[in-house]
């Protein structure tokens, strides 16, 4: 006997099909923009969710430059952050290097750019999803990411 009911199973399989279609579309768009690396589809999805901008700096990110950008872990791997889409943002190499092994809160909260950063995240909350938006601004991001990704 299955642990999922018939309706839940149908919804789950629909979700899987929809996500597969979204990933395929993102890979196709990335290829059209000239991106060649394996993570280009994921980068395109992140770029779209972020409204074509680096959340950390506000800098515009161009689809034609996907290969120049990096996928950053919101909660760094060094702090136990998982390899999970929930924990990824697209950013520039410079911003990634500046952030280093810190959460966005540790890195930006004491700077003049914090309020503008929080506003950028708030404006994109629907596209980013609430959990990711929370991770991006929380002083407790390390704890939150474990709760959000625990099985």
What do these predicted ranges mean?
Residues 58-90, 99-107:
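Histidine-centered nuclease catalytic patch
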Residues 23, 54, 68, 111-114, ...:
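Alpha-helix initiation and N-capping motif
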Residues 86-87, 91-151:
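Domain-exit/linker segments immediately C-terminal to small folded modules
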Residues 2-59, 81-84, 127-149:
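Short, charged surface segments at domain edges that flank catalytic/cofactor-binding sites
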Residues 11-17, 45-47, 60-63, 90, ...:
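Non-transmembrane, interaction-prone segments in cytosolic or luminal domains
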